[in-house]
Amino acid sequence: QVKELLVEHGEVAGVKTYFDVVIRARCVILTAGTFLNGLMHIGHTQLPGGRVAEPASYHLTESIARHGINYGRMKTGTPVRIDGRSVHFEEMEIQEGEHDYHKFSFMGRDRQLKQLPCWTCFTNPEVHEVLRSGLPDSPLYNGQIQSIGPRYCPSIETKLVTFPERGQHQLFLEPEGESTQEYYLNGFSSSLPLHIQIEALKKIPAFRDLAIYRPGYAIEYDYFDPTQLYHTLESKILPGLFMAGQVNGTTGYEEAGGQGIVAGINAALKCSGGEPFVMHRDESYIGVLIDDLVTKGVDEPYRMFTSRAEYRILLRQDDADARLTERSYQI
């Protein structure tokens, strides 16, 4: 685990680990996600970590910030992970995957992966009553958490407070993989005390015999000001330092993946003496995302939407090859 960014003559020179092992590098890519000084919240309980059972990264934020790079705090949340063997699937509605899907390339090989279904159900007034009883112990509402979370992924307690007139909220039970019984309960992100989460879920018929692997929790973490980056995602202050993902103030898998590929490409090009690779707003959603980050900055976790792209009529799935094949050939 890295604890320090090494800088020589104003440029990145490598990293140092917790075991004081020095790894020299011309470029370093930071994709630390929620691990930088990560702090998890479950009710009044606060646990240091980047994820459940995984240690947070300490000292690295401070190591970078001392060179003049600004940083702040954001938060996100995640739902319980459920043991599928305890679920009454007959009480839920199955949701099969899509069969009429389309690719972004005509050149890829056809690979058929086994498809697993998801399942849907709804909360009810009994669930809401239990959840409301736990609001005084919610870190989101008792002042324990001050950081800003993603606007478009509200916790279940935020849904209750924001939409008190709603008698139910839809939940999606999603398999974590083909070789596990673990399920992700999308729509039930929560930082309420564990006993409140379990008691509330057991009011749903499908979960009356609920068993869980991991509780839902909120997590606070450090991020860096993305306006201090170039469009290549290289730092304007520390040449050779590239950043991607939640450390730039974004939220979402695709957002992180899009930044990761751009940071990786440009780090490799910088090491090999190549020209910088910049994606523009009129040729890709990644270009829109990065341009928004480096020119406007963020005051809440950033998520990509088609409405953010003024060229969205041109940025279609069916013309991705025409837009980007030549760019990929160039690198």
Language model segments and positions:
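An anion/pyrophosphate-binding glycine-rich loop and adjacent beta-alpha core
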Residues: 62-198, 295-331
